[in-house]
Design a protein with these regions (language model features):
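Hydrophobic alpha-helical bundle segments that form small-molecule/ligand-binding pockets
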Residues: 122-126, 135-163, 200-201
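Short, basic, alpha-helical segments at the C-terminal edge of helix-turn-helix-like DNA-binding modules
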Residues: 70-76
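Hydrophobic alpha-helical segments that form the core
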Residues: 113, 158-177, 189, 193-196
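Amphipathic C-terminal alpha-helical segment
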Residues: 103, 147, 168-185, 197-201
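Helix-turn-helix
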Residues: 2, 21, 25-63, 67
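Amphipathic alpha-helical segments used for helix-helix packing
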Residues: 65, 92, 104-128
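N-terminal intrinsically disordered/low-complexity leader segments
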Residues: 1-17
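Hydrophobic alpha-helical connector segments
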Residues: 67, 78-109, 160-167
Length: 201
């Protein structure tokens, strides 16, 4: 985030709620329509705010897009950390991501991954934020995998960080195939096959 944004006065509770609503609505619109297909006017209408409010929180579209990237990454990581820290965390994680893919047929792709093709080559700041989001996501998966190592359910010679990156790459590739083919089968097959291979001792 740029210095101008970070140096702004602290938001009031009401202001924070308004800003959060703008970001949530922007995230939904961008996931549905893409970055190029979403205007500040679209977001203003969806969030039910005035033009002056919109400009107060987000003077330009780049700042809003960056906030959406942070929001999507944080939402994904928080949700998955909660599941991975539960009993049978990895199994619960597997069920969660596959259920979501079946429900949506991967329409729109991954909330974070779908932004890569739109922004990574043209916007260095956005690319850095997306990369940071994936790093946090991989770390959350790695933390969840460590319980399997502790229980002896994964070979000791497999590094949890490496396996987390592999799972994340498999997840993203599986979502892409499911999106193209219009069904969740490729996604489910990819995740289940990798988990089965990783658990072999």
């Amino acid at each position: 985030m740029n210095n101008e944004t970070s140096n702004r006065p602290r938001l009031t509770a009401k202001g924070a709620r308004t800003r959060a609503r703008i970001v949530e609505e922007a995230a939904a619109l961008i996931h549905e329509r893409g970055v190029a297909g979403t205007t500040l006017e679209d977001v203003k209408v969806a969030a039910e705010v005035s033009g002056s409010q919109m400009y107060h929180y987000f003077p330009d579209k780049n700042e809003l897009v960056q906030a959406v990237i942070d929001y999507q990454a944080e939402s994904i990581v928080n949700r998955q950390r909660q599941v991975l820290s539960s009993a049978n965390g990895v199994e619960a994680w597997r069920n969660m991501v596959i259920t979501a893919a079946k429900r949506t047929k991967a329409k729109g792709g991954c909330q974070l991954g779908s932004l890569v093709g739109q922004l990574a080559e043209s916007d260095p700041e956005a690319r850095a934020l997306i990369a940071a989001g994936f790093d946090k996501w991989a770390a959350a998966i790695s933390d969840g995998l460590r319980s399997l190592y502790a229980d002896g359910k994964l070979p000791s010679d497999i590094d949890p960080d490496d396996l987390a990156i592999t799972l994340l790459a498999t997840l993203e590739g599986g979502i892409l195939l499911a999106q193209v083919l219009g069904n969740s089968r490729p996604f489910e097959t990819a995740i289940d096959t990798l988990l089965a291979l990783a658990s072999q001792t």
